[in-house]
Amino acid sequence: MAIKANEISSLIKKQIENFTPDFEVAETGVVTYVGDGIARAYGLENAMSGELVEFSNGVLGMAQNLDATDVGIIVLGDFLSIREGDTVKRTGKIMEIQVGEELIGRVVNPLGQPVDGLGELNTGKTRPVEAKAPGVMQRKSVSEPLQTGLKAIDALVPIGRGQRELIIGDRQTGKTSVAIDAILNQKGQDMICIYVAIGQKESTVRTQVETLRKLGAMDYTIVVTASASQPSPLLYIAPYAGAAMGEEFMYNGKHVLVVYDDLSKQAVAYRELSLLLRRPPGREAYPGDVFYLHSRLLERAAKLSDDLGGGSMTALPFIETQAGDISAYIATNVISITDGQIFLENDLFYSGVRPAIDAGSSVSRVGGAAQIKAMKKVAGTLRLDLASFRELEAFTQFGSDLDEATQAKLNRGRRTVEVLKQPLHKPLAVEKQVLILYALTHGHLDDVPVDDVLDFETKMFDFFDANYAELLNVITETKDLPEEAKLDEAIKAFKNTTNY
């Protein structure tokens, strides 16, 4: 068979015309150091701050330090399998995390990967972990209450949807319990909750998840966990991952509660990373931008304007103090960023006052705007009464001769302290909170022995549920008090049926 040169040349030309180059251009570098969750790489001249990079073993990292000769990278995964001399390449992307309804009821790590053994997750939607907070014109004043179900909080330091309220106190003073109770109380309130556990023991997180599951709260809750055994980079990004998940719901007109437990451990993880990356240390060896670390996170919580759907994201950050020192560096930083703080005190906790809220040091900068009308009426003077009681109580230790007015104030104060106590994982509906506070402030408890106050409360709720449910419904529906004469009459009717 004769070979025709023109046929061969036309075939070659056709092949050349149809050729599509199947190659990828990537800027690569070489790892010069790795250890303790960070790596340094030479050769990534065009890397951007916050850009994701990929190591040769598939582990991702984030560019943090852009130095003249090399790039400081935080490793988002197992850094033990990375070796000096390995290649690392730029991806041209920033870090994103899976978001969406599919995450509800799941426990995930800060990279959005499930750690609960309930199968793979693929939501089909992602959001950047670091995002710009809503601007001034995109926000609206906080006006709707977020009921925590805890009398001491809803009456004294009310929280509104879209607020940032710091929970601060020593270890083992019930900070996590306050947040878990607040999550439990959101059942049926059209609220999605995100619990971010930062640097907690894995056994502790498991206990919290089991509590939420047992009490039906995982139906509207996402748990993000970066446990104490994980590398510092994961502890550092965990709160931002939780905020990104919350923003997805907020920008779709929904209401979200995000609990950051706790930001002290995130600050310590960030300090560790910064020192390893050789950034200049400042006060207490924290880097200069440790304030910005928390402000850019907490500013993402907002009540959006009606034009943007009116959604909200409420933040409950935790800070752990040492020996009750709320003037420490990180504590004062976060106090100045948030819209109020709830201070949990050691002495109160160990004397049996739980939740151990110190009314004098706790404040909500939103205040009455985050309370229903009925609660405003019954709790108006409660805070001042409690503060003056504490003062009088301290004063009476030095003398016993008291006039009747002082004695009456002390008696009312002791009953107030009892009323504000609450058992664990038993959040109370707002109408019942209003009822017991009304009974307290209108003197119906003055003749009840202090030790019997909680028993009186339980029996009164049962009596009202059985005989005066319509009065409770008035509070639920109108958000206002029913006629005072009717309430007084009902409480007296209850007292007549008991020994009080």
UniProtKB/Swiss-Prot annotation:
GO terms for molecular function: ADP binding; ATP binding; proton-transporting ATP synthase activity, rotational mechanism. NCBIfam families: atpA (TIGR00962), PRK13343.1 (NF009884). Produces ATP from ADP in the presence of a proton gradient across the membrane. The alpha chain is a regulatory subunit. Belongs to the ATPase alpha/beta chains family. It comes from the Bacteria. It catalyses: ATP + H2O + 4 H(+)(in) = ADP + phosphate + 5 H(+)(out). Keywords: ATP synthesis, ATP-binding, Cell membrane, CF(1), Hydrogen ion transport, Ion transport, Membrane, Nucleotide-binding, Translocase, Transport. F-type ATPases have 2 components, CF(1) - the catalytic core - and CF(0) - the membrane proton channel. CF(1) has five subunits: alpha(3), beta(3), gamma(1), delta(1), epsilon(1). CF(0) has three main subunits: a(1), b(2) and c(9-12). The alpha and beta chains form an alternating ring which encloses part of the gamma chain. CF(1) is attached to CF(0) by a central stalk formed by the gamma and epsilon chains, while a peripheral stalk is formed by the delta and b chains. It is a peripheral membrane protein. InterPro entries: ATP_synth_asu-like_sf, ATP_synth_asu_C, ATP_synth_asu_C_sf, ATP_synth_F1_a_nt-bd_dom, ATP_synth_F1_asu, ATPase_F1/V1/A1_a/bsu_N, ATPase_F1/V1/A1_a/bsu_N_sf, ATPase_F1/V1/A1_a/bsu_nucl-bd. HAMAP family: ATP_synth_alpha_bact (MF_01346). Its EC number is 7.1.2.2. Its main location: membrane. The keyword Isomerase does not apply. It is found in: Cell membrane. GO terms for cellular component: plasma membrane; proton-transporting ATP synthase complex. This is ATP synthase subunit alpha. It is an enzyme of class 7 (translocase). The record marks S362 as: Required for activity. ATP binds at G169, D170, R171, Q172, T173, G174, K175, T176.
